[in-house]
Amino acid sequence: MNQPVLVLNANYEPLNICDTRRAIGLILTGKAEMVANGRGYIRTARISYPRPSVIRLEHIVHRPRPRVKLTKREIFRRDNYTCQYCGHQAAHLTIDHIIPRHRGGQHRWDNLVTACAACNRRKGGHLMGEANMHLRRQAVEPAATASYLFGRHASDNEEWRKYIEGW
């Protein structure tokens, strides 16, 4: 009952991920319909319900465009778990402020990069030019596409791909 279910808006735009229990509740109350069933059935004493994988809401839900949250995990994911100074994929990575906070650098997407411990120590509280270091890739906020937001579940749920791609 805790398996993820992709929730689509009435126009098939990917909205969210909920668990199976919530999805079945939405279907039974008539607020959603099942689009894909790839997981068998849930059996009760009297009835068997298909276990949904993708559901579509009956009415359009208007919401603002989502943004990727600025978290350590998302910075690592954006940078592909690679040090942005030396290109090394280390087991223990850190977050580095390109312009150090004590020099007025902000805690924003364009000022944060993944760094290995050695590069972070080497750069310290200096600017990149002072430490004679360069970024391999510019730090930018990742686009909040459906494939980026829901992509980590796509490998386990192949039937989601056709609904996620293109949004």
Residue ranges with predicted function:
Residues E58-Q89:
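Glycine-rich adenosyl-nucleotide cofactor-binding module
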